[in-house]
Amino acid sequence: MQPTTQLDKYLTAVHTTLDSPAFRLNASEDTLWKSEFIQLILCVHGLLTLADQAGKRVDFLEGVGVNGKIQDITSLITWMYDRLPELATDKPGQLTTNRLNRYANQGWGYFANGSFFTAEFNNELAFFIDDQRVYLNRQIRRAISEVEHAHYQRL
């Protein structure tokens, strides 16, 4: 039996988190989706950091709003990870200061905090911190899949 690596621990945590009802398209706003999303970003960031350190950076650009320091999916997740302590100060019900939002399916508009958003795909969840967007399936699940493929290809 192989010893469990840190990467395996992150993969287990990521898949456990993704099984949460909070990541269903029809999840209500009453679910604990914000804490589940934060947990997901913590795990995915750890996973992508380990992959990067192993020389297997996940660097696709599709759907990533490339500007400034955000250059690929890994840097987008890192940017979101770096904002998590700031989000802890958001209080429920303070919509105008709420920086973490989500949108299901295709659409566009403004969140209560004034941030403009677009979500380009049906049957997809988009999560936003301020004006930065990450898609659950097209980006987060793809990044996880690429790490798994690179990791298990080595074994």
Identify the residue ranges that each predicted region occupies:
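Acidic, Ser/Thr/Gly/Pro-rich intrinsically disordered interaction regions
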Residues: 1-34, 60-155
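Short, hydrophobic, well-ordered secondary-structure elements
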Residues: 32-54, 78, 82-85
